């Protein structure tokens, strides 16, 4: 069987991508990054998801992006309830570039030619490293900057959710048996994994489940207004 490295954050998108890679016959090696994010609930979720999906291997790597700063997800900056104009303060400088680079390194070591990530260009918050152009550019880099690429192995970076709406991602996950109750999407999740119900990530998740006509299994500290209207 072919091997693949999947970036598994613990959120719903990366959980769905992990299940998709498995359905395509890949031996899944899941990679999670402890980068200095303000809460560890998402990483705890990644461990639960990896166990539930019975991946071949799950590695958690430490990278201290908090020492660089520049994001509300790593710094002591208030996380807004609503997104503003331009790139939001929850953007983490170079995060996806660094994470994909680590995935690329592990892929080289284990002999995997495929990397999967859950970036999305439809229901996303304006992050530049979620755009299709970024994924295409990184795949080019991967084949230029690695020993295996130079020696002739074609490396592929897959973003199967890139052009799906959040509702479509929900349906895709259910089709592949993903337990969304294990996942954490919230920027402000507490130690028990309960979501705030107010941040941009929560709003996207709530809207996705509502549009899909599926009950959201998330435990919310504060019930989102859209759910109160149902």
Swiss-Prot record:
Annotated positions binding ATP: 8-18
Amino acids binding Zn(2+): 186, 196, 199, 202
Signal peptide: none
Keywords: ATP-binding, Ligase, Metal-binding, Nucleotide-binding, Queuosine biosynthesis, Zinc
InterPro entries, alphabetized: QueC, Rossmann-like_a/b/a_fold
Recorded superkingdom: Bacteria
Biological or metabolic pathway of the protein: Purine metabolism; 7-cyano-7-deazaguanine biosynthesis
The keyword Ligase belongs to this UniProt entry's keyword annotation: yes
Disulfide bridge map: none
SUPFAM superfamilies for this protein: Adenine nucleotide alpha hydrolases-like
Cofactor note (record): Binds 1 zinc ion per subunit.
Reactions catalysed: 7-carboxy-7-deazaguanine + NH4(+) + ATP = 7-cyano-7-deazaguanine + ADP + phosphate + H2O + H(+)
One record GO biological process: queuosine biosynthetic process
E.C. no: 6.3.4.20
Cofactor(s) it depends on: Zn(2+)
Molecular function via GO: ATP binding; ligase activity, forming carbon-nitrogen bonds; zinc ion binding
HAMAP family from the UniProt entry: QueC
Family in the record: Belongs to the QueC family.
Function: Catalyzes the ATP-dependent conversion of 7-carboxy-7-deazaguanine (CDG) to 7-cyano-7-deazaguanine (preQ(0)).
NCBIfam families to which the protein is assigned, alphabetical: 7-cyano-7-deazaguanine synthase QueC (TIGR00364)
UniProt protein name: 7-cyano-7-deazaguanine synthase
